[in-house]
């Protein structure tokens, strides 16, 4: 596979079909290489981003937005929140939420998707214990193959939100650096980073600098 020609979807296709060995993603995307692209569930693992030269190690955090129509009634909004419990996604450990967790885990197991821990959004003990119990009951993978990722993202200070400013442009500049490094063993990393920094600074100046 040519890493310079891949995007979110085709990258997972390459990973799932044997055209690539590594992909940068998170635990919410494990269905892409497996269920969507046919990778054996036992051939997938997750690891944390490597630490930098000073030992600093970070992971990007984000989330999936749930939106309501501006015309939604209070009853409709309340029902939508209730549906989060039905899906097992709410920060509760009641019967409805646990049944949702179990249904999701059963569906994953049936369709060859890793049944693993969730991203540490909710930290109340009742929820975490209930979720861990469901994962243990429906597990279809060797958890050691995923533990290093979860150990990292659960460390205090590991999770960082996107940088303020035009983060997508920053990603584009860093993608140029990554692609150059993995396709040219003699790439001048410092020069590439300096160029990326200069280009990104120009973007910030043009978009945010006040006259």
Regions found by a protein language model. Give the residues of each.
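Extracytoplasmic/secreted envelope proteins and their assembly/folding machinery
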Residues: 12, 16, 27-30, 77-84, ...
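Extracytoplasmic ligand-binding clamshell segments of periplasmic binding protein
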Residues: 1-36, 47-49, 192
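C-terminal lobe and pocket-closing loops
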Residues: 33-39, 55-60, 67-172
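Sec-exported extracytoplasmic/periplasmic mature domains
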Residues: 16, 20, 28, 35, ...
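Short, well-ordered loop/turn elements at secondary-structure boundaries
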Residues: 16-19, 41, 62
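Small-molecule pocket liners
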Residues: 44, 63-66
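Conserved N-terminal structural module of periplasmic/extracytoplasmic solute-binding proteins
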Residues: 75, 91, 95, 163-166, ...
């Amino acid at each position: 596979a040519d890493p310079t020609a891949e995007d979110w979807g085709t990258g997972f296709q390459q990973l799932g079909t044997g055209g690539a060995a590594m992909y940068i993603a998170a635990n919410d995307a494990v269905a892409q290489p497996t269920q969507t692209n046919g990778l054996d569930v036992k051939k997938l693992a997750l690891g944390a981003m490597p630490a930098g030269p000073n030992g600093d190690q970070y992971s990007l955090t984000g989330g999936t937005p749930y939106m309501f129509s501006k015309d939604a009634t209070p009853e409709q909004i309340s029902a939508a929140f209730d549906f989060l419990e039905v899906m097992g996604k709410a920060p509760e450990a009641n019967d409805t939420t646990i049944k949702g967790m179990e249904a999701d885990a059963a569906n994953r197991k049936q369709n060859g998707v890793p049944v693993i821990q969730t991203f540490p959004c909710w930290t109340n003990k009742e929820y975490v214990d209930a979720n861990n119990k469901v994962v243990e009951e429906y597990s279809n993978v060797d958890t050691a193959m995923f533990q290093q990722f979860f150990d990292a993202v659960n460390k205090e200070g590991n999770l960082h939100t996107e940088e303020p400013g035009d983060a997508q442009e920053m990603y584009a500049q860093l993608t140029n650096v990554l692609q150059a490094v993995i396709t040219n063993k003699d790439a001048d990393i410092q020069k590439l980073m300096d160029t990326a920094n200069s280009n990104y600074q120009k973007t910030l100046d043009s978009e945010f600098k006040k006259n």
